[in-house]
Amino acid sequence: MSGMSICFAMREAVEWILHLDPVFMHVGPLEIRWYALSYVFGILFAHWHITKASQCLALDKKFLDSLMLWAVIGIILGGRTAYILLYNPSFYWEYPSEILQTWHGGMSMHGGYVGCIIAVSIVCKKHRVRVMPVLDLCACAAPLGLFLGRMANLVNGELYGRATTTCLGVVFPSSGDLVPRHPSQVYEAMLEGLLPLLFMSILARYTKVRLRFGVLSHMFGAWYGIVRCAVEFFREPDPQVGYIAFGWLTMGQVLSAPIAVVGIFMLVLTVLREKPREGVADISA
């Protein structure tokens, strides 16, 4: 099978997903959307993964249930607040009733990232548990949620890429033109979701990286920040924001660069300073 044939096959798969109905099913007057399901299954996977992986940390069920609840709240509040303030403040100032209508879309990954860290830190402090090993668990579970979320963006026909003449170019009806564009949602799903999920799972399972608390969480932050900055060059900027500067710098890059820098710095610092643990670790604060 030639490279061109593979390219066209990938495009056909993307187009098939793109033309799915954003509403998965109706239950009476209630619409169940693919986007909502991406959150549900991402949360369920995170709960399963964290519960299973936490056995080596001797974390009790009460703590884990509290952790999942507040992590989800932190992601939603952080993601929604950041989107409102950074991406579309004038719209929500004019239509404040839309603030609570999250099913209409409008979430920021960067806000969700910060919100989750804050929520996890608060829960850990309350239960007198060290933060970094718990964030490591969250970091290994997060990529699947990112993968599902980006694929749901594709179903919604949103966050599409810039114009391209390559064989991967797809026409997005929501763009308002017939110009083939990069399926940037798929790029992000693979590079921010599937690839780090596989890579970090291998590291956590088959290497001693997991014994150095903080390495996995800082690695995820560095990975996401770098990849997001790169993929933004293929993604059309949000129309209500446009380019921030230089005719190419986007809001996504402005927010991702600090995450990458801090992640790299903390990763190096952790590798140099954190001593590996053996067996069931005591992570009491």
Curated annotation (Swiss-Prot):
Topology in the lipid bilayer: Multi-pass membrane protein
Pfam families with a match to the protein in the record: LGT
Keyword tags: Cell inner membrane, Cell membrane, Membrane, Transferase, Transmembrane, Transmembrane helix
MF GO annotations: phosphatidylglycerol-prolipoprotein diacylglyceryl transferase activity
Gene source species: Anaplasma marginale (strain Florida)
Coiled-coil parts of chain: none
E.C. no: 2.5.1.145
Uppermost EC category: transferase
Entry protein name: Phosphatidylglycerol--prolipoprotein diacylglyceryl transferase
Family annotation (HAMAP family): Lgt
Family note: Belongs to the Lgt family.
Cellular location(s): Cell inner membrane
Residues involved in a 1,2-diacyl-sn-glycero-3-phospho-(1'-sn-glycerol) binding: 150
Function, in words: Catalyzes the transfer of the diacylglyceryl group from phosphatidylglycerol to the sulfhydryl group of the N-terminal cysteine of a prolipoprotein, the first step in the formation of mature lipoproteins.
GO-annotated biological processes: lipoprotein biosynthetic process
